[in-house]
Structure formats: structure tokens, C-alpha cells
Curated annotation (Swiss-Prot):
The lineage of its organism: Eukaryota, Fungi, Dikarya, Ascomycota, Saccharomycotina. This is Topoisomerase I damage affected protein 2. It comes from the Eukaryota. The gene is TDA2. It comes from Lachancea thermotolerans (strain ATCC 56472 / CBS 6340 / NRRL Y-8284) (Yeast). Keywords: Cell projection, Cytoplasm. One of its GO terms (cellular component) is cell projection. Belongs to the TDA2 family. It is found in: Cytoplasm; Cell projection.
Amino acid sequence: MPALEVNSVPSSSEFPVAPEKLASIIETSARDASSDDLGACTESILVELSKASSAHKFVVSLTKVAFSDSEDFNLSIDSSIGGSWNKTKDGGYSHSVETEAGARLLATVVWVSK
């Protein structure tokens, strides 16, 4: 798979768990759930995030990007998420994980303080 860059810096100063833990939760859930079942992977991430912080509500979005290496093409994916929220307490985080099948999962976690 070609090089991929994802900005994985939390967008607020207060986040539910350390960025490294967020990445670990996403990677573990992606590895444990079938890459064909995005719903199960999303649910797994939500369960782990809820265990990690009871002070936040969470939204998780997963996008699966898969293509054949034998084809010659350009792939461009742009995504933006925003919210009307408290910028010091609420935020978002994006992370990319390569699956065993060679696909790429792009995960976005959004949190809002309760």
C-alpha cells in the first residue's frame, strides 16, 4: 500500500485517554474484529473508550480503503469533521491502521465532555 499520512494529534487539550492509548484501542479493535465487519470493529472501539472514560461521550467513524495493487490509479480521500463544541474539553482524533488483508482503516474518534 502506498505511503499514507494521517494527522493523529488530538484536537483539544483535554482528551479521554493519552493519544498512544487511543491508537492502541483502535489498532487492537481493528486486529480483533474482522476487517469486513466495520460495525463490530466500531462497537469494540466504543466499548473500550467507554471503559477508559466515563466523563465523555464518543462517536467513532471507520472508513475502509481497499484496492488492488496490480491496478494503476490515483486515490485521493479528503475528509473533514467539525463540531460546535467546547474546544478545550471536546475534540477529535484520527488514526490509520493497515489490516491483514492489506486494506487501510481510517478511524476518527470524536469526544464530547458530559
